[in-house]
């Protein structure tokens, strides 16, 4: 399997997963949750 393709998929998944996680993390730090 092409490592470049794997790297792109991992990067894409990381960006998609990090978005909501960052929002939840910031909300939790503010005591919103």
Curated annotation (Swiss-Prot):
Source taxon at top rank: Eukaryota
TM spans (from-to): 5-25
Keywords, sorted A to Z: Chloroplast, Membrane, Photosynthesis, Photosystem II, Plastid, Thylakoid, Transmembrane, Transmembrane helix
Membrane topology: Single-pass membrane protein
Localization in the cell: Plastid, Chloroplast thylakoid membrane
GO biological process: photosynthesis
Keyword Membrane: yes
GO cellular component, one term: photosystem II
Predominant location category: plastid
Pfam families to which the protein is assigned, alphabetical: PSII_Ycf12
Oligomer and partners: PSII is composed of 1 copy each of membrane proteins PsbA, PsbB, PsbC, PsbD, PsbE, PsbF, PsbH, PsbI, PsbJ, PsbK, PsbL, PsbM, PsbT, PsbX, PsbY, PsbZ, Psb30/Ycf12, peripheral proteins of the oxygen-evolving complex and a large number of cofactors. It forms dimeric complexes.
UniProt family annotation: Belongs to the Psb30/Ycf12 family.
Reported function: A core subunit of photosystem II (PSII), probably helps stabilize the reaction center.
Protein name: Photosystem II reaction center protein Psb30
């Amino acid at each position: 399997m092409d490592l470049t393709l794997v790297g792109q998929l991992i990067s894409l998944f990381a960006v998609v997963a990090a978005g909501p996680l960052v929002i939840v993390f910031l909300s939790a730090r503010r005591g919103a949750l």
